[in-house]
């Protein structure tokens, strides 16, 4: 019986490994390379690079924030500006949780106001 459980675990591990490698290969075919940073098991940032021959160039950067329940509260994206050689804010998604629902609000960066501006028509509330 223990051998059967061990065999099942090995099969699951092999399938997971193959799926991970397939995902990695698919990302490589798109010429995008992903580099994630985790803290205490939570992804706090991810930088995406474009591959051009032997060169990697900055493309997108994502930052994530969480509440005390490890629920994502913010997902901010930035685009690389090659002219200014820096990251520029692009989009911010904020999540609000209550006992029965989660509300998702989308904000677009406004460089003139130097702030994220709510896009009200994209606000969505869903039951848990």
Predicted regions and their residues:
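Bacterial N-terminal signal peptides
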Residues: 10-20
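Buried hydrophobic residues that stabilize the cores of well-folded domains
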Residues: 5, 22-128
């Amino acid at each position: 019986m223990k051998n059967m459980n061990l065999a099942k675990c090995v099969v699951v591990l092999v399938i997971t490994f193959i799926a991970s490698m397939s995902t990695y290969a698919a990302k490589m075919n798109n010429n995008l390379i992903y580099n994630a940073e985790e803290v205490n098991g939570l992804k706090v940032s991810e930088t995406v690079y474009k591959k051009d021959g032997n060169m990697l160039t900055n493309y997108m950067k994502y930052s994530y924030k969480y509440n005390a329940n490890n629920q994502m509260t913010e997902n901010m994206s930035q685009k690389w500006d090659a002219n200014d050689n820096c990251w520029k804010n692009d989009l911010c998604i904020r999540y609000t949780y209550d006992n029965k629902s989660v509300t998702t609000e989308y904000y677009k960066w406004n460089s003139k106001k130097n702030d994220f501006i709510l896009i009200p028509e994209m606000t969505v509330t869903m039951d848990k």
